[in-house]
Amino acid sequence: MASTKMGALNETECTFEFIKVAASQTLTKGELCTVDASGNAIVCPTNYAGATQTYVIDEDITTAAGETSRVARFVKTGPCAVKIDAAVTEGATIMPSDATAGQIEVFAGTNYNLMIGYARPTEVGGTNARIEINKTR
């Protein structure tokens, strides 16, 4: 069954970071994000080979052109519901999607730098999945 809640699922088990959001961004709760060269949050690009800093945004936020002072809360590690672009199976290792920015998919291939966590045993499927982000770099 798909989770109806996006973002952090258990705040006591999560590690959060508060990050400035880049200008001209619309980030929705449950999207996979990363930071740009300036350290501002953006939607994670497809098949993001440099997935050294990935987060799941825990709130909806929209920034205007030139606006870089708004801060949002992101899940760095722990259980959260995130948008998926394809079916995710229980226990599967997950990575940034190679088809849809801001979403995840089951890990495939040999580039282990893409792995960001694994699917939790419940609430898997539908348009979002419960995952455990356990990669910290």
Sequence positions of predicted segments:
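Glycine-anchored, exposed beta-strand/edge motif detector
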Residues: 1-137
